[in-house]
């Protein structure tokens, strides 16, 4: 999971057309996030492997995986919010 999150953050920081969708994906999967999960948008805009990684995370949202994910993404939360409209 760490490699996927790091890759997605690099995509966001590249400031391309994919930055917004990747920032949205990362923020939406945080526990208690105010961002709405928009699977159809992600499916259309994101890389298939990254999309599947987020789906797997959703399936395991009540396990330790979600807390591991939160620890990885939380330090970037403020930065990611700048990319989401």
List each model region and its residues.
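Generic structural signal for hydrophobic core residues of well-folded globular domains
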Residues: 12, 29-33, 57-61, 83
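Residue-level detector of alpha-helical secondary structure
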Residues: 9, 27, 55, 77, ...
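Mixed-charge (polyampholyte) low-complexity IDRs
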Residues: 42-44
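Short terminal alpha-helical segments
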Residues: 1-27
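Short alpha-helix boundary/capping elements
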Residues: 16-19, 30-37, 46-51, 62
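Hydrophobic core segments within long, regular secondary-structure runs in both alpha-
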Residues: 5, 48-55
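Low-complexity intrinsically disordered segments
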Residues: 65-85
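Basic, alpha-helical nucleic-acid-binding regions used in initiation and control of genome expression
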Residues: 52-57, 61-72
């Amino acid at each position: 999971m760490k490699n996927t999150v790091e890759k997605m953050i690099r995509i966001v920081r590249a400031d391309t057309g994919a930055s917004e969708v990747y920032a949205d994906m990362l923020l939406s999967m945080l526990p208690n996030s105010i961002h709405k999960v928009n699977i159809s948008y992600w499916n259309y805009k994101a890389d298939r492997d990254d999309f599947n990684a987020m789906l797997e995370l959703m399936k395991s949202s009540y396990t330790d995986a979600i807390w591991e994910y939160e620890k990885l993404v939380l330090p970037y939360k403020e930065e990611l919010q700048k990319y989401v409209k």
